[in-house]
Amino acid sequence: MGSDWDEIKRLAADFQKAQLTSTLQKLSERNCVEIVTLLLEKQMLEVVFTNDGKEYITPDHLEREIQDELYVNGGRANLVEVSKTLNVDLSRIELLAERISAENQSVHLVLGQLIDEDYISHIAQEINEKLVQRGEVSISELASQFDLPSDFLQHDVVEKHLGKIIKGRQDASNPRVFFTQAYIQRCKAKIRGALAAITRPINVAVILQKIGVQEKIFYSLLDEIAPAGQVTSKQANSQYVPHIYAKTQADWVNSFYKQNSFLEYDAIQKLGISDAKSYIRKQFPNEEFLYLKRVALGARLVELTVVTALNECSATKQYLDLTTILPSNLSEEDIEEVFSTIMAQKHSNPSNFVYLDGIVFSQPYLAQLVQPCQALAESQAKAAIDGGVYQQYIVEKTLAQKGNVSTQELEDEGKVDKRDERRKKASSGKAGGGAQGRETKTKSTKKHQRGKAAAQFDSDDEDDAQQGSRGGGGASKKAVKPLELVKTADIVKLITASLEEEGLEHLSKSIASLYTNQFNQTALARAQELFEATPQTNRRQTHAAIQDRINTLLIDIRLYEKGLKLFPQDTQTQLVKYLLKSLGNEICNELSLYVASECNLTVKNTNLNVDQRNKLAQECEAQYRAALLEQNKALNKSIDDFELATETVLKTCSMIIKKVDKKKDRLLIADHKKKLQKQLLECNEPALLLHLAALILFTTITGSILHASGKFVSAILQHIRGSLNEDQNALLLRYHDLVLQVLQAIPDSNESKLANEHLQTMQNQVVELAQNFSRASISKAD
């Protein structure tokens, strides 16, 4: 202490001596500037000018000034601030700072700042204090706090003083984190206590939130703690599952399986187990399971219960209700999946069983159940043959397979030709006509005796040209709808009674649908057998029927010819033409279809026009072709020509023409008149009533029958006019005029209503005249 005081005294004396000593020579400021400039030019002196250029300083002195600033600022100086303080360019300051840090190992140049060891020791002490307070610090936090690079802080500050000034340790998993041993012990105690208190699965995030421990520390200390549980993963949604809970889960699963021999995935998932199948495999490594979509069945339940019951069902030829042997909480989908899986895994033949809504039927049981359907198929096949349904199906099928019928021809055959329709109406035709020769359009009458068709009002010959001009397009096949002889409803009726006894009537439709196609095919096969077994018998019956039919029509034509010959020549010509177009056309159709059948040709529609018959004749065998074509041509000639042509066709068909028996003519005429009178009594339409009345009066007066359409009514009334008295003629003429008035008037108009009222009043008189008129009345009139 004394030596220091002596040194101070010595320095004070030197300072006083310097102040009292005078210089030998004083220089002016200008001289000083010139001297310094000269020294600089001769590079004998190096100085650093200030920013304003008024002052200069040597580099060594500037270096001392920088070190002084570092000391003044506590060991950390920003070079920018030093540059401002010393008024020296920043670049000169940076160069000197680099030299200082290079020459002095205790000084560091970091991001434009000079930092000495004193400052580093100071912040190390601060870091230690913070570590003591918080127990854990990270380099990133320190870098933010001290505004220093993280690498500098970690290597030159923390790691350098770790264990010396900084009392802590570095995290092995994260080198940028440091903590104290006391902090680690506190965290370990928190984690151990929290995990010990948990009895059910809980998210790790919840645990960390409750105890205030960081996730990385939790996972790093978890293995050291050895908790009574396990963490599912280290992901964000990881859970901690205590061993006590896992044991409880295992106990519940084992108990449930022991009692029920199956496990539900949903029930296991409710226990907190996400992958139920994996858990079952892990929990029961030595057990075999049948894994379904919703449940896992144990091998004991499958082998001893289900498989055994199925074998018994097959042996006894009965059915098995799976719902009675499987757990009650299984759905229908689960039960069906059990059956399907067993069939696949146990190598059973699925064809031995039929599964329907939880019920497994053996094939023998179902075969016995539907046995009565064999008789049903037999009866349906016979009915199809007797009714001609199967024959029609064969025709359509053959036609579709050939594919040689044009589209337009199919359309033509599907449409009813106007002329053919008129020829199939009642022979009395339509009512109308009058003394003035006006035509009237009315409805047709009904058929007369022996099935002869009556005709409608024949409009004109243009219909013939239009019908004959219809042509066909290209060939096309037409799909044929499969014939259903046995339907599902038929089978349901037969099996419902047997199923009701077992309480299974709700499955009748499902079972019937399984066998509908089988029995329908059986019925079709049986129908084919019947069809093939009776062709000759059917052919003989068809030959006889056609022969009788043609002879009947020829007799009708002969009788009608007698009646039409009573008219003038021009009217006769029209009546002959109409007669041939109706009854003659019908004869041609009958013979053409018969010949087509003999030649094994298929015809879809039996109502043929002239063109269609000609095309059909071209396809027939040569022995029939010429006769059929000639008969078609004769329709436009006389009745005698047509009869001769028809006889030729009959001979080619080996049919006999019956001899004329004139004794029966009067009976036929009387029978025809009775038919017309019956129709008249049932008729309420004025136009048709007048038509029938005219035909009846003609037959009564002439003793002949007449085949005429509605347009000939006026000619008929004119012909019988002389056989009636004035009142009768006036009645018929007045009635005829009223009919025309109704047809020409607007429907529901006053004129139409008034005319209908008059017609209604006169109707009984016209009916009475037609019904009661006799030859005696003719004599009285004369």
From Swiss-Prot:
It is an enzyme of class 2 (transferase). GO terms for cellular component: cytosol; endomembrane system; endoplasmic reticulum membrane. The keyword Lipoprotein does not apply. Residues 404-478 are annotated as: Disordered. One of its GO terms (molecular function) is UFM1 ligase activity. It holds the Pfam family UFL1_C. It comes from the Eukaryota. One of its GO terms (biological process) is protein ufmylation. The keyword Membrane does not apply. E3 UFM1-protein ligase that mediates ufmylation of target proteins. Belongs to the UFL1 family. This is E3 UFM1-protein ligase 1 homolog. It comes from Drosophila melanogaster (Fruit fly).
